[in-house]
Regions:
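Hydrophobic, Leu/Ile/Phe/Ala-enriched alpha-helical segments that form helix-helix packing faces
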Residues: 23, 66, 70, 118-119, ...
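Charged/polar, low-hydrophobicity segments characteristic of intrinsically disordered regions
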Residues: 17-26, 48, 91-105, 180
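Short, glycine/charged-rich beta-strand-loop motifs at protein surfaces that mediate ligand recognition
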Residues: 156-163
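Short coil/loop linkers at secondary-structure junctions
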Residues: 28-30, 72-76, 160, 180
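C-terminal structured interaction module
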Residues: 164-201
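Generic structural motif
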Residues: 29, 34, 126-130, 181
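N-terminal, charged low-complexity regulatory/assembly segments
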Residues: 1-68
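Amphipathic interaction/junction segments at domain boundaries or subunit interfaces
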Residues: 58-62, 68-156
């Protein structure tokens, strides 16, 4: 895919967050090698157009780069990623909170996104159904992902086993936004879909 401004921006954001955390932990890491690997992965990646989840696609690419260009285990890379993003104040502002995320006014846009995703214009992009919670449900917003861009990217890069670590990041992000995420299965673990259910804490 084209390595444009958006991919550079997300890459810079993830790289700076992780490298600040690496410095705190006094880790001996080749920053340049990680950055170059990220760029290489993004350029080789299948295009997903102007996907709403481009940030997640880039997050997956950077996680692969971290694993390839550091001596750290996947678990240690996950912890570095998690702690780096958690300590980034700008990231907290960018992800927002439960009130903004669960705003009913966003539902028409989400439903259009879902309909567009089922056209499968881009092989690696996410395909999603939106589930609106009812008063009888214990969630307000649900997603059933039938295709996962991160899983596709990891599979293309020959490291599908790394996808499950990024699944755990969803709980970190939900916690930052003061939301409760319930999920019973993921594509990364061999299921047919990922069933996200979000509610307020």
């Amino acid at each position: 895919m084209e390595y444009g401004f958006t991919q550079k921006l997300f890459g810079y954001f993830y790289h700076s967050s992780c490298m600040k955390q690496a410095a705190k932990q006094k880790l001996d890491i080749n920053k340049k090698a990680i950055k170059q690997e990220y760029v290489s992965i993004m350029k080789n990646a299948k295009d997903i157009g102007k996907s709403r989840l481009m940030s997640s696609y880039c997050m997956g690419a950077y996680f692969i780069a971290l694993n390839r260009k550091t001596p750290l285990s996947p678990e240690a890379c996950y912890e570095l990623y998690k702690d780096g993003l958690s300590s980034n104040k700008l990231f907290h502002i960018a992800v927002g909170n439960a009130n903004s995320y669960l705003d009913k006014k966003k539902m028409p846009g989400r439903l259009k996104w879902s309909a567009d995703s089922h056209l499968r214009r881009y092989e690696n992009d996410w395909v999603v159904d939106i589930i609106e919670g009812t008063p009888q449900d214990d969630f307000e917003l649900g997603y059933d992902y039938h295709t996962c861009g991160i899983c596709n990217l990891c599979r293309d890069e020959g490291c599908f086993e790394l996808a499950k670590y990024l699944c755990r990041m969803d709980y970190v992000l939900a916690d930052m936004m003061q939301m409760k995420l319930t999920r019973t299965k993921t594509i990364a673990e061999g299921a047919d879909l990922c069933d996200f259910r979000y509610g307020r804490k």
